[in-house]
């Protein structure tokens, strides 16, 4: 059984969300658009949507097997998936296992420093504001989530990290950092939403020492390194080789 596509509900930088014939579900189309720096840099990369969809499906199912709830229902095609409709929390959760990127620009922490335990940062999801960092006081002031919900969010995010880090390590990929979006479904259950892919994760090839060659994620696009699709394809190949074939939507 397939899901019937309805009207376009939302179009973001990397995905389109459509209504389906089930009120509690939506269809997600993964686009070939590549963006960086809050969409100030843009490009079309053939096959990017398919790769991110397939990687995300494999990783969502991996999390589910480990008891971590996600919004994923099943694949509709190679670049479409069906997911539960969720109320997305306007907070971006970032887990950092290795210091790089903005953390090193904003602090004296050296590039490549291992962070144990992982550093968890919360950001307010607003492109116009540049996704600012949320302190505890700002969270309270904005009244985005209750203290209990914040604890639930952070616990779930650390559980995701505890599953993904050793999984990627077994594939000779270092999970440097990643961002998560979470939301509540109709039953009030907190779910991992959005996607988990090289668009949302920094992944370094542990077989390579060169700081640029080892990058297998969106930084290849950000830094004009080239080989973006080849890098995403390599991640997809390793992930698919270590996980069951993702289920189709039924």
Swiss-Prot record:
Pfam families: SAICAR_synt
Alphabetized InterPro entries for the sequence: SAICAR_synt/ADE2_N, SAICAR_synt_PurC, SAICAR_synth, SAICAR_synthetase, SAICAR_synthetase_CS
This protein's pathway: Purine metabolism; IMP biosynthesis via de novo pathway; 5-amino-1-(5-phospho-D-ribosyl)imidazole-4-carboxamide from 5-amino-1-(5-phospho-D-ribosyl)imidazole-4-carboxylate: step 1/2
Assigned keywords, A-Z: ATP-binding, Ligase, Nucleotide-binding, Purine biosynthesis
Any single GO BP term: 'de novo' IMP biosynthetic process
GO MF term list: ATP binding; phosphoribosylaminoimidazolesuccinocarboxamide synthase activity
PROSITE patterns referenced in this protein's UniProt entry, alphabetically: SAICAR_SYNTHETASE_1
Documented EC number(s): 6.3.2.6
Catalytic reaction equation(s): 5-amino-1-(5-phospho-D-ribosyl)imidazole-4-carboxylate + L-aspartate + ATP = (2S)-2-[5-amino-1-(5-phospho-beta-D-ribosyl)imidazole-4-carboxamido]succinate + ADP + phosphate + 2 H(+)
Xref: NCBIfam families: purC
Similarity annotation: Belongs to the SAICAR synthetase family.
Record protein name field: Phosphoribosylaminoimidazole-succinocarboxamide synthase
Species annotation: Synechococcus sp. (strain CC9311)
């Amino acid at each position: 059984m397939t899901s019937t596509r309805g009207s376009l509900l939302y179009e973001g930088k990397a995905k389109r969300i459509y209504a389906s014939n089930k009120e509690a579900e939506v269809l997600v189309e993964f686009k070939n658009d590549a963006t960086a720096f809050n969409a100030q840099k843009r490009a079309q990369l053939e096959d990017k949507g398919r790769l991110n969809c397939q990687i995300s499906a494999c990783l969502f199912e991996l999390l589910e097997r480990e008891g971590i709830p996600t919004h994923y229902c099943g694949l509709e095609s190679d670049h479409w998936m069906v997911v539960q409709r969720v109320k997305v929390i306007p907070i971006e959760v970032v887990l950092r296992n290795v210091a790089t990127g903005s953390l090193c620009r904003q602090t004296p922490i050296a590039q490549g420093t291992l962070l144990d335990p992982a550093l968890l940062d919360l950001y307010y999801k607003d492109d116009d504001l540049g996704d600012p960092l949320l302190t505890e006081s700002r969270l309270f002031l904005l009244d985005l989530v209750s203290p209990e919900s914040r604890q639930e969010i952070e616990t779930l995010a650390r559980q995701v990290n505890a599953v993904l880090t050793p999984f990627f390590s077994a594939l000779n990929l270092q999970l440097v950092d990643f961002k998560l979006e979470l939301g509540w479904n109709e039953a009030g259950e907190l779910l991992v939403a959005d996607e988990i892919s090289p668009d949302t994760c920094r992944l370094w090839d542990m077989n390579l020492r060169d700081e640029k060659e080892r990058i297998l994620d969106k930084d290849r696009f950000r830094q004009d390194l080239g080989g973006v699709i080849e890098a995403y394809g390599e991640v997809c190949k390793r992930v698919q080789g270590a996980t069951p074939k993702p289920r189709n939507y039924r």
